[in-house]
Amino acid sequence: MVTSDVGNDKLRSAHRRAMPKELLDSMNVIRIFLLAKIPPHEKSIEQNVIEEESRTFGDILQGSFWEHYRYLPIKALMGLQWAAINYDKASYIVKVDDDTAFSLEGTFKLLTNMKVKGDFFMGYILNNTEPVRDNRTKWYVSREEYAKDEFPPYLSGGFYVTTPNTARRVIKEAKNHPYFFLEDLFVTGFMTQVLNIKLIQLPKGFWLHYYELLKCCIDDMIFKRIMCDAIVGLPPDDGENDLIVTFNDAIRSCQNCSARTKEEALDKVCEAYVKVKHTLGEKYY
């Protein structure tokens, strides 16, 4: 399931090109884009266009709430409920943001090899994070919303994996829990803490938390013929509509590439990453 802003038609198009329906069918995978209502102030998007997109591709689920950052938990829970009800026999539910680059084949291979059992959420675990108290940002959390100085462990919301049974438990608990607007924290932090659901860290190297690393990984596949182990990468701050297409095309054209050696570790040889890390110090890790 792909959380997508109602106006991000170019990103949805990129997902469909990177992973066309024929590929999804061959892997027994269902994809759904999760949208909300067009905000009243938004004049550049028309509902009839969204409905036409839905009729054409049959892969859109649109909620009755407004499209807004603070409603992302509702959107994620809507998707989890839809998946748990309609595909209760599915092995896994994968949630991604529409601007996240990921490899479906790589994710499938990883899950097959790991053979995870029981209720879980798997992704990039964030530990010891603190609430943002700067009211000028969209991540601002007031003391009334959350009084403690540290959040419980949770997963980055750009990509995570769970199961239908886990989703059902979370949906049931969410109805009885005070609402919190940070989707990844609410779903994979507060809910998992209350329900004692385990968080699983993606193996090292499978998640590229900074765009500089993803760009180097893609370039190495194209120009140096070195395989990229990552299955997930995050976009640049200013976005890149076709990033998921570029990433998947590079992976598929690199099936016979050489494996990356320890001496070629991305965090050592990626000059753009090393430069920015040196500039920002420990804040950039």
Language model feature labels by segment:
Residues 1-285:
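Secretory-pathway lumenal glyco-enzymes, predominantly type II signal-anchor Golgi glycosyltransferases
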